[in-house]
């Protein structure tokens, strides 16, 4: 028990969590997933309740009647069996109940995929902030080294005091930027941990420019999209509801058998009885016709929603695919600019150390590099978001 307690405490915090681990935890711990799983269990019991209307019903009764001393007390025992023989409404209701369970299973799949998308978004948001911290650390190291160089030159009387003050100011800015980046990273970790229902102290991963093979995106969307599957199932259930309403036109037939044993009877054999019942509603004021019409209208409404949703998702998919291509081209351009900015900073630093360039030139080159590297990270982050949207829509 002590070992188990220590093990559970150790699980409360997650260090260096990967994307795969985060996706696994999301599917296990997300509130929406757990609620959907409970709803499936509730619908399983609902099916049992509906199934009871087509199964035999057995009832028994025991009675004792005390009379005066001059009369004989009466003891009675009865048992009855009722078996539906033909009840189309009950069968159609059972189909609807089973369809509802299947619908909830599809909803669970849809919720799971949406949770995966949310995990990806929050994970890559945290990863972006972590990369910002790395950039801030590199920037801080650069200005620390620059300050040491300027202090040496100032002590030797080579550089004026304004250069020293400027170097200290840039170092202070770098420290402040690092603290801000660390705080944003911790906020991103807390947001991810809130979704995963756990404490996360760090994540592990890197931005990758993953390529996915795209065929007929409209076909893949219709075949694989979980949200469309949910809406398609709603149409099926609406059609089943139409059949259920139509089944109410038909009569019901049931058999009833009973046995009664009573001490008041002269012959116990008289206690058996059997009945065959036919129930039919002759006229209900066209209520059933109205119910069928309403059910048909619901089918039309669900069909319209399905077509609108399909068009909406297809438009979103095309936009996301277009974004992937555009961002990929932008990343290639930024990477080239990044190499150029690194070389420009190297040359400016060397020129400054040899007294050819000013510290302002170095400052401008460093700021340009920081801006380009941040732009590259943002582009990689946007690429992952668009990729997550595409995966959500067609996988």
How does the language model describe each region?
Residues 34, 57-74, 84-110, 229, ...:
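Small/polar (Gly/Ser/Thr/Ala-rich) solvent-exposed segments
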Residues 78-80, 123, 254, 275-277, ...:
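Membrane-embedded beta-strand positions in outer-membrane beta-barrel channels/transporters
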Residues 17, 112-223, 320-323, 327, ...:
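Periplasmic alpha-helical coiled-coil/stalk elements that build and connect Gram-negative outer-membrane
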Residues 71-72, 146, 176-179, 183, ...:
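Outer-membrane beta-barrel domain signature
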Residues 15-59, 98, 158-161, 196-239, ...:
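Bacterial Sec-pathway N-terminal export signals of envelope proteins
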Residues 3-12:
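Sec-dependent N-terminal signal peptides
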Residues 35-50, 111-138, 145-147, 151-152, ...:
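Amphipathic alpha-helical coiled-coil segments
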């Amino acid at each position: 028990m002590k070992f188990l307690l220590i093990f559970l405490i150790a699980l409360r915090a997650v260090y260096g969590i990967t994307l795969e681990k985060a996706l696994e935890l999301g599917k296990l711990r997300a509130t929406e997933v757990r609620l959907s799983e409970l709803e499936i269990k509730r619908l399983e019991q609902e099916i049992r309740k509906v199934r009871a209307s087509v199964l035999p019903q057995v009832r028994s009764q025991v009675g004792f009647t005390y009379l005066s001393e001059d009369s004989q007390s009466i003891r009675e025992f009865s048992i009855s069996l009722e078996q539906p023989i033909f009840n189309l409404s009950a069968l159609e209701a059972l189909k609807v109940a089973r369809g509802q369970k299947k619908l909830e299973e599809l909803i669970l799949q849809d919720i799971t995929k949406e949770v995966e998308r949310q995990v990806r978004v929050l994970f890559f948001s945290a990863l972006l902030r972590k990369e910002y911290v790395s950039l801030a650390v590199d920037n801080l190291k650069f200005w620390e080294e620059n300050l040491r160089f300027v202090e040496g030159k100032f002590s030797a009387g080579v550089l004026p005091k304004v250069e020293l003050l400027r170097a200290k100011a840039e170092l202070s800015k770098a420290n402040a930027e690092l603290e801000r980046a660390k705080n944003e990273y911790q906020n991103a970790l807390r947001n991810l941990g809130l979704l995963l229902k756990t404490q996360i102290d760090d994540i592990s991963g890197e931005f990758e420019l993953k390529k996915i093979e795209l065929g007929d995106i409209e076909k893949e969307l219709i075949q694989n999209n979980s949200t469309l599957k949910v809406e398609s199932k709603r149409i099926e259930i609406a059609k089943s509801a139409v059949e259920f309403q139509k089944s109410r036109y038909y009569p019901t037939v049931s058999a009833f058998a009973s046995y009664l044993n009573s001490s008041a009877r002269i012959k116990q054999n008289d206690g058996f009885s059997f009945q065959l019942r036919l129930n039919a509603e002759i006229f209900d004021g066209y209520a059933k016709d109205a119910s069928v019409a309403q059910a048909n209208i619901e089918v039309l409404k669900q069909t319209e929603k399905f077509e609108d949703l399909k068009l909406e998702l297809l438009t979103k998919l095309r936009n996301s695919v277009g974004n992937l291509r555009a961002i990929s081209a932008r990343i290639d351009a930024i990477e080239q600019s990044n190499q150029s900015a690194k070389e420009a900073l190297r040359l400016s630093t060397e020129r400054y150390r040899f007294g050819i360039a000013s510290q302002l030139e170095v400052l401008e080159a460093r700021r340009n590099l920081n801006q380009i590297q941040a732009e590259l990270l943002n582009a990689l982050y946007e690429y992952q978001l668009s990729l997550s949207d595409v995966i959500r829509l067609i996988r």
